UniProtKB/Swiss-Prot annotation:
Purpose of the protein: Catalyzes the dephosphorylation of undecaprenyl diphosphate (UPP). Confers resistance to bacitracin.
Stretches that traverse the bilayer: 19-39, 42-62, 80-100, 108-128, 143-163, 181-201, 220-240, 243-263
Gene Ontology molecular function: any one: undecaprenyl-diphosphatase activity
Pfam families: BacA (PF02673)
Keywords tagged on the record: Antibiotic resistance, Cell inner membrane, Cell membrane, Cell shape, Cell wall biogenesis/degradation, Hydrolase, Membrane, Peptidoglycan synthesis, Transmembrane, Transmembrane helix
Note: Bacitracin is thought to be involved in the inhibition of peptidoglycan synthesis by sequestering undecaprenyl diphosphate, thereby reducing the pool of lipid carrier available.
Gene encoding the protein: uppP
InterPro entries per record: UppP
Name of this chain's protein: Undecaprenyl-diphosphatase
HAMAP family: Undec_diphosphatase
Topology in the lipid bilayer: Multi-pass membrane protein
Length: 265
């Protein structure tokens, strides 16, 4: 498979799965191994094309992001207060990721670790959906700093490739009293600062792996990731208001089982 075609495939996978509770990184690792696109350069490529998915969320929620940087507060979740909550959500995983980045790439970027994370995350989704916690937060404007920090702590689980940042933050929000649709919406918006910082940091650290000839491939992955993320996020916004997360948990278990039983030893 040519690098350009690999970029298209991986861009679709990244955009379609980044904001679903199924783990985009886990899917990229599995698909990368299947198409022979592996190694340190491939791992960094997977992280860098996240920028396309990030931009998709910014476009979909552009008004919310504008309110965050606008000097005049428009809602409770805007201006300095909104930025402060996003900072609190990004802080725990950001600090741990900064310290453990090399170890995570060295020991957890493999199909077996991904399959285990998919399984653990699926079990947790089932448990969270059985929760008896009463919803206390229904909109972004009802978010509190404590809720934002709590979701950020759950986000640390996403440092395990295959667990899913989206799953971790949505489950965390639900356990802390957020309505499922609010937890999903905040998961999208709250992802942007951490993902943007992680992508830029990874590119800075791995820039020596890429040459000018790779810019075209990176561009393809970026554009395809952007388009597929736009479609996926819009669809998920509708779905999460109508169904639970259980179908995604069953999918995770099925994919994990396929890896455990059929992946070459």
């Amino acid at each position: 498979m040519t690098e350009s075609l690999a970029a298209v495939v991986l861009g679709i996978v990244e955009g379609a799965t980044e904001f679903l509770p199924v783990s985009s990184t886990g899917h990229l690792i599995l698909v990368g191994h299947l198409i022979g696109f592996t190694g340190e350069k491939a791992d960094s490529f997977d992280v860098i094309i996240q920028l396309g998915a990030i931009l998709a969320v910014v476009c979909l929620y552009w008004r919310r992001f504008w309110w965050l940087v606008s000097p005049k507060p428009h809602h409770a979740f805007s201006g300095i207060r909104g930025l402060w909550m996003l900072f609190l959500t990004s802080l725990p995983a950001g600090l741990i990721g900064l310290v453990a980045r090399k170890s995570i790439k060295a020991y957890l970027f493999n199909p077996w670790s991904v399959a285990l994370a998919l399984s653990v995350g699926a079990v947790m989704i089932f448990l969270v959906e059985q929760r008896k916690t009463r919803d206390r937060y229904y909109s972004l404007d009802e978010m509190t700093p404590g809720l934002a920090l709590g979701i950020g702590c759950f986000q640390c689980l996403s440092l395990w490739p295959g667990f899913s940042r989206s799953a971790a933050t949505i489950m965390g929000g639900m356990l802390l009293g957020a309505k499922r649709s609010l937890a999903a919406e905040y998961s999208f918006i709250g992802a942007v600062p951490l993902m943007f910082a992680a992508t830029l940091y990874d590119f800075y650290k791995s820039a020596h792996l890429f040459s000018a000839d790779d810019l075209g491939v990176l561009g393809i992955g970026f554009v395809v990731s952007f388009v597929s993320a736009l479609i996926a996020v819009k669809a998920f916004i509708v779905l999460v208001q109508r169904i639970t997360l259980r179908p995604f948990a069953w999918y995770r278990l099925a994919l994990a089982a396929a890896v455990f039983f059929f992946w070459p030893k």
